[in-house]
Amino acid sequence: MPKRLPRARTLKGDPKLAHYDLGGGGTGEPPILLLHQSLARSEDWENIFPRLATRYRTVAYDARGHGKSGRAPDYSLRGFADDALRMLREIVKEPALLVGHSLGALAALIAAGDAPDLVRGLVLEDPALGYAKAWDPAQYASLREGIASTEPAVLAKAVSKFPLPSPGPHGERTYGELRGFYAAERVVTYFRDVDPAFIDARTAGDAPAAALITDALGKVKAPVLVLAGEPRLGGQVDDSAEWRLKKLADVTVKRFPGSGHLLHGFRPEQFIENIEPFLRKLRES
């Protein structure tokens, strides 16, 4: 099991945001803010956080309606981006590198477009540019029932059968087949604290998100590193998405051959190896 995160702290507000911050960091090094994917929590960075924190001030936080953060009446992409801005302004308090996965990548992208003075650079892990599209309610019905249930066994069963967003290292298709970082008994701790209303919001879709994403792609001037999986394995950056991302002012796209959507979870060493040169470039700029 990876090293645990530091003790959670709370940023008061609406909603409250649980965050994890070891402080420190080398002189002249940018702080790093980690933004997790949908249905996860800050523990999803446990295999990355300690490695980054040896050199950089590293901060992670639970998105609204996830983990230890508060629930909210609004689960639009705009709301998630506003929370990223709150973290930058009230906790990080200096220009940072934002590292976001999937939903977290989109929140980071929009925050960077809205507040360029707060962002040194972006690492976007398999950003889901098609976020506006609604999730399939049938695919998430059992999981939602499990999250809402007061019986832990109901959620455990739903998680064990829930399909992975991309195949595991040995071709696994469900969380129940996995061992290690994304084993079902670990992922249960992610899902159990998700607000069922978040799933309701995603199955309804988020039409305004499309314009938000397009607008941000035109506004962001900071350097951007996109880490992408293979679309055939569940990666979200297909040819059309890559074409859109390459309209960013300063962007590099790197593929993870043989990987899908869960890059840092399944390939932490490769993930770190890819972002370290990007961080050196930021230091020298």
Where are these regions (language model features)?
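Conserved loop-alpha-helix segment in the C-terminal half of the alpha/beta-hydrolase fold
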Residues: 50, 219-259
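Catalytic histidine-centered segment of alpha/beta-hydrolase-like enzymes
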Residues: 259-268, 272
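Active-site loop/oxyanion-hole signature of alpha/beta-hydrolase fold enzymes
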Residues: 21-23, 49-50, 59-99, 103, ...
